[in-house]
Regions:
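Generic structural signal for buried aliphatic residues
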Residues: 185, 250, 256-257, 328-333
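N-terminal intrinsically disordered, low-complexity, charge/repeat-rich segments that act as generic
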Residues: 49-53, 58-216, 223-225, 242
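Phosphate/adenylate-binding glycine loop and adjacent helical scaffold
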Residues: 244-247, 328, 334, 345
């Protein structure tokens, strides 16, 4: 038998349950002294595991998982929830990956068993964790170095971030002014947005306005619920990890966060970015607890709107079009630290105006 433990592992691996299940960390003996492998870990209890043929056993020689190699449809058909006594199933998909993973998720959706997939890189692991929307229960990451483990940890951190509700602040509009022409950015996403959802945009990183999507119906133009008319190229946009980037830096494949009126967020992928010269309007606002002015420039068009605060249980009013925005109207802001270095918040003195 091959012992999978801190003292005798021949390949590094990490098993991570995406829905809060037990985390298993298997590392090479020459990785143990690497400080970065335990970065962020306060206390760890590690249970040695043993691989014997197609089974994984614990220290008491009890089977805790069964390993299945899958390279044909027939081998996939043999994996059935009712046939296995072990609580965990580990699949090694040697041929196709996406469709077999989806079939396994469908077959085990009402089962109490945990299904993990073996992967040798983070990109492959992401495929398994996102298959059929729900993903498999976890990953056994079989690697020779610690970097893919840290990459997978970063992926889980980003997904966990989606469960955190952002604190949005009410701000009162103090000035509205036609500004002239500029290069504005339309951000087209790979996901649809609902009324009340949009992207966090602003001229200053310290205050980002919640800019509504073009999901609302109009008599003159079809709704585009995948699009946010986001503002000029210089503006900041919120991206995962508490970071910002410039609108001009966005491109296909980048991730941004979609936020609703209540601060709930989700990570979405940018499908396309359009930059065109359009007339702009300047909107300035202040929050009651701060005398600083926070501003945003947006295209001067009826389809561009700022999300407003919830009014009690009234879910009908979601946004003010910039063309009908008035001084005194209330909009939603995300207030945060203003000093940034490559999009990362830092502590330093800065003046933005």
């Amino acid at each position: 038998m091959e012992e999978l433990s801190l003292n005798g592992t021949k390949t590094g691996a990490v098993g991570h349950g995406i829905n809060g299940s037990t985390n298993l960390l298997w590392v090479q003996s020459n990785m143990v002294e690497r400080k970065d492998i335990i970065n962020g870990i306060t206390i760890a209890v590690i249970s040695p595991l043993f691989a014997s043929e197609k089974e994984i056993l614990d220290a008491q020689n009890k089977r805790v998982a069964t390993i299945f190699d899958v390279s044909t449809p027939e081998e996939l058909e043999r994996i059935r929830p009712e046939d296995e006594q072990a609580p965990n199933i580990v699949v090694n998909l040697l041929d196709w990956q996406v469709i077999p993973a989806e079939n396994i998720i469908a077959a085990f959706q009402n089962s109490q068993k945990t299904v993990l997939a073996i992967s040798d890189n983070t990109s492959e692991a992401q495929i398994f964790l996102e298959a059929l929307e729900h993903g498999l229960d976890g990953i056994v990451l079989k690697v020779e170095d610690v970097e893919p483990i840290l990459e997978l940890k970063e992926y889980f951190d980003r997904r966990t971030e989606e469960n955190n509700v952002l604190n949005l602040t009410k701000a009162t509009v103090t000035n509205i002014q036609v500004a002239g022409m500029g290069d504005r950015v339309c951000v087209d996403l790979c996901s649809l947005m609902r009324p009340g959802e949009g992207l966090l945009i602003g001229s200053f990183a310290r205050g980002l306005f919640l800019v509504h999507s073009e999901c609302l119906e109009s008599n003159y133009i079809a709704s585009r619920p995948f699009r946010v008319n986001a503002g000029p190229v210089h503006a900041y946009i919120a991206v995962p990890g508490g970071r910002t980037c410039y609108l001009s830096e966005l491109k296909s494949g980048k991730e941004v966060i979609v936020v609703d009126q209540q601060g709930r967020q989700r990570i979405v992928i940018v499908g396309r970015v359009k930059i065109e010269s359009r007339p702009l309007i300047l909107v300035e606002a202040k929050i009651d607890s701060d005398n600083q002015t926070i501003s945003i420039l947006l295209q001067n068009a009826e389809t561009v709107a700022l999300v407003c605060p919830l009014q009690g249980n009234n879910l009908l009013k979601t946004a003010f079009p910039v063309t009908s925005l008035k001084v005194g109207d209330e909009v939603l802001l995300r207030v945060q630290g203003g000093a940034r270095h490559t999009g990362i918040e830092i502590q330093e003195f800065i003046v933005e105006k």
